[in-house]
UniProtKB/Swiss-Prot annotation:
GO terms, molecular function: beta-glucosidase activity
Residue ranges annotated for the PA14 domain, each copy included: 411-579
Organism of origin: Aspergillus fumigatus (strain CBS 144.89 / FGSC A1163 / CEA10)
Keyword annotations: Carbohydrate metabolism, Cellulose degradation, Glycoprotein, Glycosidase, Hydrolase, Polysaccharide degradation, Secreted
Enzyme class: hydrolase
Keyword Iron: no
GO process annotations (BP): cellulose catabolic process
Pathway in which this enzyme or protein is active: Glycan metabolism; cellulose degradation
Protein name listed in UniProt: Probable beta-glucosidase J
Enzyme Commission code(s) on record: 3.2.1.21
């Protein structure tokens, strides 16, 4: 990579460079040159650096036809591990993946708060708790930085819903803003000093975050002393002078909308001073300097990594993220149902059994090196002859992608041929052989979801162009097949020359492609097994459509198309078949849940329910096989009306490349579960604290639950949820004793000199090695508090691995200010009030809780990190 001065470059070098930059060059540096790269100035040795999504894998520069990558478990899965060392190692892996993709800046982690269960991007973030989120983010960032890559904390702040995300104003009290939504950023910056922070799309109390001086200038840079770069979310800049003056350094992506000539005009009219401009330029140059540590060449080619040690780490992460929610006894053996016996035949049922639900949708999605389904993971462990499968029902929102099941006409390779044209198709239809157009590009592809945001070709200018998708489909069995076509643009699907889906003539707005696309339009056709059926799609990019976009969404240019298909299923018959098999089976695993179809950037879920047919399937199987193990995959809470009937229940999230192996490892005891819920699972949607005020209404969303987010609400109101925050069982048993709490410097005038040292003795009282997570909560003074406070709040945690019979002391150090303070709106600062607090150490299992008193001798006010 070209470099400013990668060896010993200091502040004076940057000062010198700024003095040599022309005004036009300074302005150019403050925006991207394309979707993923910053502006270069070769004459001064300033290179372009590359950014990449994030947060659970490094995609590289291409949504469209990209290079495969390693996919980590989703954010909530990582939060469930409560393992900072593991997350640090995964950060190191992400850095290596970034370098393989030629990237210097990773756009992750996401550390927004799941104030409710429906947020489309809820799966990306670690937890509903700000301390767990902030400490996990610090470990993530430290690991990424250890590999020389710059991590990016996102999204500052209150980007907690997708509905009207670029237009909505989050109305939040100063106290809730500080104690819940900003605290993860504060802790991550304190613990890791990441090189970049990304602003959110939304407004905060009436002002967009990317032009909000209170957030960027006063809190981030002023109070916290943050010295890194502040970059916009993609197309999340809304002004010229306001954003620059507030402290937004880099507008992304390019070409610019609000810098360039507009910023030059703001400079000449004194809307922006050159001093302020130089401050923004300095931060961009410092980002480039920091990025040079990666040793990645400028505009480096993208390549695969996929190392054996990475696959092992991903498998470990997948297994250690699985939460054991229930493990009751088998009535016939009087032993816990799990782990299962690999010598017995296992019946695997359900919509997620043969589906690789490895990641959520949107900017967190990527093309994985490989994926493992639960069925495959179980078969690989037990032997294929020991595993029987029954579908039960489908769980997809959109029909499964068809691309990998197609074959090219020319060579018979898996996939299809994608041809790009600058001219529209003939009126008679290009599939009839009357197409005289010459394609400007021809690609062989397997992924039939094609998002064209970053597709480019020298012969194409602008966003208007056309494409065809062509291949053959040979069905494994005869029957009626459903096909679905989703577009941000226009599309027609032909099977054997017959129009099966028209998504052009009349279109319906949907949530696809970040909210700018259509619903999936479907059609049916009877197909014969063993026959090659011709599949052809005519597509026009987004400008060819007259569809009106939803208000408050981000438009990503040319749009895209998605082609899906599968055999039509009679759900009642499929459930009946599954039930008949379950009644005779030795042991049964039912795999249900969501996928990236249901949880994605661009839209929120309308409800917490699992897909249609799922509840009926689970109830029917449990009626004949009460010992069936239920495995749920989702990134955020779902309703489980059958949970009281289920004796064995796992929450398995989106587990990345190794999702299926991680599930199988826990099911059969190769991994002893140690994960805990990082989110509260309510019994139903109306029980959650944000129920009455989640969506945008006339451009604003009221955070009416205030500081009582997640478990803070349930604990304070005494409402029992379905599963509590921090719940998670093990195949081992543990015992906590001898809790001690010691305060250092109890009378220090500066509370930052004071801390708590919480120590507890932990014993493994079982015959199986296992890991225990010790959660430390602090209860505020019951009578002496000057404001209402939650019953208890998480302030620290530690994970410890113990052999059978082993005993160890676990010590956790917590800053006293973090442990005892609330945000005092009267003095605009943190206040630690004197009084009698109680410290709780909580382990696995009912009643495994210890309590010790803590007396804070003096009240103290503080600010900053």
């Amino acid at each position: 990579m070209g470099s400013i001065d990668t060896v010993g470059m200091g502040q004076r070098a940057i000062d010198q460079i700024i003095s040599e930059l022309s005004l036009n060059e300074k302005v150019a540096l403050l925006s991207g040159v394309d979707a993923w790269h910053t502006f270069a100035i070769p004459r001064l040795g300033i290179p372009s650096i590359r950014t990449t999504d994030g947060p659970n894998g490094a995609r590289g520069t291409r949504y469209f036809n990209g290079v495969p990558s390693a996919c980590l478990p989703c954010g909530t899965a990582l939060g469930a591990t409560f393992d900072r060392d593991l997350i640090f190692s995964l950060g190191q892996l992400l850095a290596a993946e970034c370098r393989a993709k030629g990237a210097h800046v990773l756009l992750g982690p996401t550390i927004n708060i799941q104030r409710g269960p429906l947020g489309g991007r809820g799966f990306e973030s670690f937890s509903e708790d700000p301390v767990l989120s902030g400490l996990a983010a610090a470990s993530y960032c430290s690991g990424v930085q250890d590999g020389g890559v710059v991590p990016t904390l996102k999204h500052l702040v209150c980007n907690d819903q997708e509905h009207e995300r670029v237009a909505v104003s989050a109305l939040v009290t100063p106290r809730a803003l500080r104690e819940i939504y900003l605290l993860p950023f504060q802790l991550a910056i304190q613990g890791a000093r990441p090189g970049a922070v990304m602003t959110s799309y939304n407004k905060v109390n009436g002002l967009h975050a990317s032009e909000n001086p209170g957030l960027i200038r006063d809190i981030l840079r002023g109070e916290w002393g943050y010295e890194g770069a502040v970059i916009s979310d993609w197309f999340g800049t809304y002004s010229v002078a306001d954003a620059v003056n507030a402290g937004l350094d880099l507008e992304m992506p390019g070409p610019t909308r609000f810098r360039g000539p507009a910023l030059m005009h703001a400079l000449t009219s004194n809307k922006v001073s050159e001093k302020t401009l130089n401050e923004r330029v300095r931060k961009v140059l410092e980002l480039v300097q920091l990025a040079s540590r990666a040793g990645v060449p400028e505009y480096a080619p993208e390549r695969k990594l996929n190392r054996p040690e990475d696959r092992a780490l991903l498998r470990r992460a997948a297994g250690e993220s699985v939460v054991l929610l229930k493990n009751d006894k088998n009535d016939s053996t009087n032993s816990p149902i799990l782990p299962l016996d690999r010598e017995k035949t296992t019946l695997v049922i359900g919509p997620n059994a043969d589906l690789a639900a490895y990641c959520g949708g949107g900017s967190a999605s990527l093309l994985a090196y490989y994926t493992v389904t639960p069925r495959q993971g179980i078969a690989d462990k037990c032997g294929a002859e020991q595993v029987v499968f029954s579908q039960g029902c489908y769980g997809h929102k959109e029909l499964p992608l068809l691309g990998e099941h197609l074959r090219t006409i020319e060579t018979g390779q898996p996939g299809y041929t994608f041809r790009v044209y600058t001219e529209p198709p003939p009126a008679s239809g290009s599939f009839k052989g009357s197409d005289s157009r010459t394609p400007v590009d021809e690609l062989h592809m397997t992924n039939s979801s094609a998002f064209l945001m970053d597709y480019s070709h020298p012969q194409i200018s602008g966003d208007t162009y056309y494409a065809t998708l062509e291949g053959t489909f040979e069905p494994p069995e005869s029957g009626v097949y459903e096909f679905g076509l989703t577009v941000a643009g226009t599309g027609l699907l032909y099977i054997d020359g017959v129009l099966v889906v028209d998504n052009k003539t009349v279109q319906r707005a949907g949530t696809s492609f970040f909210g700018i696309g259509t619903v999936e339009e479907r059609g049916e056709r009877y197909l014969e097994a063993g026959k090659k059926h011709h599949v052809f799609v005519e597509f026009g990019t987004a400008p060819t459509s007259n569809l009106q976009h939803h208000h408050g969404v981000v438009s990503f240019g040319p749009g895209g198309l998605r082609l899906g298909g599968c055999r039509k299923l009679d759900t009642d018959t499929a459930i009946q078949q599954a039930v008949q098999s379950a009644a005779q089976a030795d042991q049964v695993v039912v795999c249900v849940g969501l996928s990236g179809d249901w949880e994605s950037e661009g839209f929120d879920r309308p409800h917490m329910d699992l897909p249609p047919g799922t509840e009926e399937l689970v109830n029917a199987v449990l009626a004949v096989q009460p010992n069936a193990v239920i495995v749920v995959q989702s990134g955020t809470p779902v309703t489980m009306p059958w949970a009281d009937k289920a004796k064995a229940l796992l929450q398995a999230w989106y587990g990345g490349n190794e999702a299926g192996n991680g599930i199988a490892d826990v099911l059969f005891g190769d991994v002893n579960p140690s994960a805990k819920l990082p989110l509260t699972f309510p019994r139903e949607l109306s029980q959650n604290p944000s129920y009455l005020s989640y969506r945008s209404e006339r451009g604003r969303v009221l955070y009416s639950e205030d500081i009582y987010v997640g478990y803070r609400y349930y604990d304070t109101t005494g409402q029992p949820p379905l599963f509590r925050f921090g719940h998670g069982l093990s195949y081992s048993t543990f015992h906590l004793r001898d809790l001690t709490v010691r305060e250092t410097a109890p009378y220090a005038a500066n509370i930052k000199e004071s801390s708590l040292r919480v120590s507890v003795t932990v014993s493994n009282t079982s015959a199986r090695p296992g890991a225990e997570v010790v959660l430390v909560y602090v209860r505020p003074p019951a009578a002496a508090c000057s404001v209402g406070r939650p019953v208890r709040e998480l302030k620290g945690y530690e994970k410890v691995m113990l052999q059978p019979g082993e005993t160890r002391e676990v010590s956790i150090t917590i800053p006293l200010g973090l442990a005892t303070s609330f945000w005092d709106e009267g003095c605009d600062a943190w206040l630690s009030e004197k009084g009698l607090y109680f410290v709780e150490a909580v382990g696995t299992g009912e009643g495994n809780t210890l309590v010790a008193p803590l007396t804070v001798q003096v009240s103290r006010v503080w600010n900053g990190l």
